[in-house]
Amino acid sequence: MQQYDVTGMTCAACSARVEKAVSKVPGVTSCSVNLLTNSMGVEGTASSSDIIAAVTNAGYGASVKGAKPEKSAKSSENVQKNAFRSMKHRLIASLVFLVILMYFSMGHMMWGFPLPPFLEGNHTAMGLIQLLLTAAVMVINQRFFISGFRSLVRGAPNMDTLVALGASAAFGYSTAALFAMTDAQLHGGAEAAMPFMDEFYFESAAMILTLITVGKMLEARSKGKTTDALKSLMKLAPSEATVIRGGEELTIPAEQLAVGDIFAVKPGESIPADGVVIEGSSAVNESALTGESLPVDKSEGSKVSAATINQSGYLRCRAEKVGGDTALSKIIQMVSDASATKAPIAKLADKVSGVFVPVVIGIALVTIAVWLLCGQTVGYSLARGISVLVISCPCALGLATPVAIMVGNGMGAKNGILFKTAVSLEETGKVSIVALDKTGTITKGEPAVTDVIPAAGVTRGELLSSACALESRSEHPLASAVMAYCSENGAAPQETEEFTALPGSGLSAKLNGSALLGGSVKFISEKSEMPDELRAETDRLSGEGKTPLCFARDGKLLGVIAAADVIKPESPEAVKQLRNMGIRVVMLTGDNERTAKAVGAQAGVDEVIAGVLPDGKEAVIRSLKEQGKIAMVGDGINDAPALTRADIGIAIGAGTDIAIDAADVVLMNSRLTDVPAAVRLSRASLRNIKENLFWAFIYNTIGIPLAAGVFVNLFGWSLDPMFGAAAMSLSSFCVVSNALRLNFVKVHSPAHDRKIHHISNKHHKEEKSMEVTMKIEGMMCGHCEAAVKKALEALPTVESAEVSHEKGTAVVKLSAETPFETLKKAVEDKDYKVIG
């Protein structure tokens, strides 16, 4: 997407005009204009010159945004500051003249303020002073007239047109009344001129312009706050970097840093580029990028990111990504691109905005004509028409969606949740199914030791010492898990001899003359005797989805160490939160059914789909899409097709660049709880957009009839043009202020979650409990039943056991496949005999 800065837009009618003009350019496939940021995003093959020409011909200005988002944004911010300063000066000058005008026009009549003696009874002089003061206010605010009438001549009237027409009509009519009064005074004296004083609307013209300027200032200030999150990100990047050249430290501008440069970072400094630590260790605060408040330890080989803060030690790093390629720049670009797109919900407002101003002008003319036909004076009829013009506000409609999108995206960026488009921000909250890839998403993606079970007569330390010696020379992933666990528990590797790795089976080596063996249950069973109690333990571990590793020395079993790709601590909570939102959670994995169900049970998902090959995930997602709107969460290369196929693709931040490119939402952390947080933020943003649109529509729906005088005969309600201008000024301010409430949304708090979908098992297979019937001898009474029941239900995979001593049976319901030997052992340990 190519982005452009657009100048001269003042309301939704302007943005609609620009969008319509650019969309007609050959080669443009999509165009989205953002009134909030005065920017435009264009996709297609059209050249920049053709696009800029189309905008210029529509009466506005356009320029290509800078290549670096940080510089472009800073330039845009400077333009906004200058515009705000100019607006402030205009307002102060307008207020000075308005106060004097109100003193002469209303102060004497309403509050009895004294007038200079030469003005007492001199109505013509009073009118002339009001004309001059009003003219001064009009000159100060001439931009409304230049923009408004230029747009009218081009056939694309905007909000400035409404203001210009309203103020001009009030000024023109009052000027005509002044000339008529002068003529009457010349021919009939002061008494003949007196009635014309009530026909002056000079103060209305000046008040309209001043109040609209007040509203524009409030709106500009509030709009500035909507981009605070993006501005804070841009300010994170350091302006200077310390590079090592010729063994010396040199300070250079950060933008001159090149890939491969060695740079130093002292405690308290920001890291200037993405890179890798080559010397030193420290704790780095990465909260700016990930939202994670706890510092992350860094040492040689660790990755570091630009704009994160080195907190303690001295680091030397090699730059790998600089300038616009850093993670920070990509985040800024992503947030900026998302703000340049439009949400589907904005389409209605866009359609209305395109015809809003011409319709309002038509209503104003009809209003004037109707009141004249009803016998009212020209002044009264004109006042009603002016009220219609100045109360109507297309800005509120135009801002309703983009302000909420901007604030929502900013909130997401603060919390490490990046929505690539406005569509993804709107649609994420509507998903009814979330499919989670198991490895790296629900689980940590790397094996870890979960159980250490020494054999009888063997100490825990003895088992770990032998396992450490044997696994130290293995390159298997499970060996790394065992070594890490041994290191944490004080077991150091010892030098072995005659080390042999038998593919698919196990390991063998000699340590101090003793023969060590390690490997699968089957491999060790063939080499040494395995006691029944340890065999039962290995069956239990396998049933829980773990991999038991057995170790023996000189033919004697030392014990079992189990390893598994353990689930992340926050995964069950994340799944629970999603289910509490009414979202069905499905786990996809290539693992076998038994392992998959064990992990699924720990995570608490609704459904497990096991045995899914990498290229089969996309087909599963296609099938699930028939049952509802689906989000796919993954991190690997083989997840990319599924992420693309899903309605919303969510990439875990620790994943690959390919997965991130294919996704609609990127989670900078690897926390699964960020998925419900993204849904929560999306729902809050969509709710805010609906509130804004409701306010904008209801304001105009009620305000225009009130201004036209529809309720005068029914309730006696009418609206002075000055109050109409005040209402118009506040309408946009209210919409922007409402959007700012999104800053207070607690995206990680489930306190206010509610279900918008009902989780139904209608479309997916039930997780039916397996049932096993055991025949047992030796049970004589209810106490026997209770003992057997308690023993069976103590097993983790047993849901319930119905035991009958009269029938001599136990009906066992299982949540996962469980070896019969495990059930049998549990019963026979209580001195009963299982016969079938």
Where in this protein do the model-derived segments appear?
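Conserved cytosolic catalytic loops of P-type ATPases
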Residues: 26-49, 199-200, 231-325, 422-467, ...
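Membrane-embedded alpha-helical bundles of multi-pass transporters
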Residues: 110-124, 153, 172, 411, ...
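Flexible metal-binding regulatory segments at protein termini and peripheral loops
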Residues: 1-127, 150, 232, 248-249, ...
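Conserved catalytic phosphorylation-site environment of P-type ATPases
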Residues: 289, 348, 383, 396-470, ...
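Conserved ATP-binding TGD loop and adjacent catalytic N/P-domain core of P-type ATPases
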Residues: 16, 267, 431, 511-513, ...
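Juxtamembrane coupling segments of multi-pass membrane pumps/enzymes
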Residues: 71, 75, 181-185, 190-193, ...
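ATP-driven catalytic headpiece of P-type ATPases
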Residues: 89, 308, 429-475, 505-586, ...
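Transmembrane helix-loop-helix hairpins at the membrane interface
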Residues: 85-240, 351, 716-721, 727
